UniProtKB/Swiss-Prot annotation:
Record keywords: Acyltransferase, Amino-acid biosynthesis, Arginine biosynthesis, Autocatalytic cleavage, Cytoplasm, Multifunctional enzyme, Transferase
Record-level Gene Ontology MF annotations: glutamate N-acetyltransferase activity; L-glutamate N-acetyltransferase activity
Pathway field: Amino-acid biosynthesis; L-arginine biosynthesis; L-ornithine and N-acetyl-L-glutamate from L-glutamate and N(2)-acetyl-L-ornithine (cyclic): step 1/1; Amino-acid biosynthesis; L-arginine biosynthesis; N(2)-acetyl-L-ornithine from L-glutamate: step 1/4
Protein name: Arginine biosynthesis bifunctional protein ArgJ
Catalytic class of the enzyme: transferase
Subcellular location: Cytoplasm
């Protein structure tokens, strides 16, 4: 995808900078600015009840009806910092607003990094001073600046009929439905209302980011933001706009899965044959979070017994004597018993498709995306601490 990302649509500028938050010295702040003429903003947030200070603030900003800018910092989550964390995000946003000459509630704030560490306000203000003069066609630098344990920047561009949608994202660990530990910013020069933007974003998140389950942990900071400015002068149909937002979210979700911490396998789990879609989703998530199953995927082992043991724990209607399991479309378990060719199924490739029929004949169906559990995942997360 284009390295321009969030600056691919007309009327958006961005920048990345080093404020010194990360001990590595890598870039750790980004700014995306909507130059108008319209300033539509919509967002979807974490469902974790422990919510970071920037999420609290950005919820208020989005409810205000307009968004002109999004400020990002990486290396510090500003989560679980109590009242001081709330004060700090207000102070930083007020500082940026004074520089941009806009209302503070026209600015969203997003943070990612270590939880429970005080926000280095002085550093971040100095970072703001670097970002503003650097604003331009710098979507790639902004995407680089929001990474934490990511190994590559994640960007997308969707070219439509006279209008464009761009985006960037970050996140490779602590991923589970309710987004993932991730921040995503989408921008478009299409003419849309806030209601249209919110509806499209919510629908897209449900079938992309909310199906991504790397390790069962849900972040305090998840935020997906969509900015629209109408600079193209084009008003797409509802279907056209929904499709573009879905395409962008799906692309970023694929990139998140591919760069998940320690990933050696990309696994898609589809569950059918239960009473409702929600039951199927529960079973798929239960399997996707099961460590024994994930270890089997790391070892390229078509261990259908671990699949049955995992889905048996799910809150879903099933016929325990009639469950079928397929790896890469090859039957390894039929009517809850192994097939003769089960151990010969080749799972040595990066992508593994797992299909489970719970055997009730019901219409319920759902899928999730996950990864294996590797040595590197443990190494990364044992080293990532305060």
């Amino acid at each position: 995808m284009s390295s321009r990302g969030v600056t691919a649509p007309q009327g958006f500028v961005a920048a990345g900078a080093t404020a010194g938050i990360k001990p590595s010295g890598n870039k750790d702040m980004a700014l995306v600015v909507n130059q108008g003429p319209e300033f539509v903003g919509a967002a979807v947030f974490t469902r974790n009840r422990v919510v970071a200070s920037p999420v609290k603030y950005t919820k208020k900003a989005v409810a205000n009806g307009t968004l002109r800018a999004v400020l990002y910092n990486s290396g510090n989550a500003n989560a679980c910092n109590g009242v001081q964390g709330d004060k700090d995000v207000h102070e930083i946003v007020d500082y940026l607003a004074s520089k941009l000459k806009v209302d503070p509630l026209d600015i969203a704030a997003c943070s990612t990094g270590l939880i429970g560490e005080p926000l280095p306000v002085t550093m971040i203000k100095a970072g703001v001073d670097k970002l503003i003069p650097a604003l331009g066609d710098n979507g790639g630098e902004a995407a680089d600046s929001i990474m934490t344990t990511d190994t590559v920047a994640k960007e997308t561009v969707v070219k439509c009929n006279g209008w464009t949608l761009g985006g960037m994202g970050k996140g490779v660990g602590m991923m589970a439905p309710s987004l993932a530990t991730m921040l995503v910013c989408l921008t478009t020069d299409a003419c849309v209302t806030q209601a249209q933007a919110h509806a499209a974003l919510s629908k897209a998140c449900d079938v992309t980011f909310n199906t991504l389950d790397i390790d069962g942990s849900t972040s305090t900071n998840d935020t997906v933001i969509l900015l629209a400015n109408g600079a193209s002068g084009i008003t797409p149909t509802e279907s056209e706009f929904n499709d573009a937002v879905l395409q962008a979210c799906a692309d970023i979700a694929d990139q998140l899965q591919a760069d998940a911490e320690g990933v050696t396998k990309r696994v898609r789990i589809t569950v059918t044959g239960t009473t409702t879609d929600s039951q199927a989703l529960n079973a798929a998530r239960t399997l996707g979070r099961d460590n024994l199953f994930k270890c089997a995927m790391f070892g390229s082992d078509p261990n259908w017994g671990r699949v049955l043991a995992a889905v048996g724990m799910a809150d879903a209607d099933m016929d325990p004597d009639n469950i079928s399991v397929y790896f890469n479309d090859q039957p390894v378990c039929l009517q809850s018993g192994g097939t003769p060719e089960a151990r010969q199924v080749d799972l040595s490739g990066i992508d593994i498709d797992v299909r489970v029929d719970l055997g009730t004949g019901g219409p319920g169906k759902a899928f999730v995306r996950t990864t294996d559990l590797s040595h590197q995942y443990v190494e990364i997360n044992s080293a990532y601490s305060s």
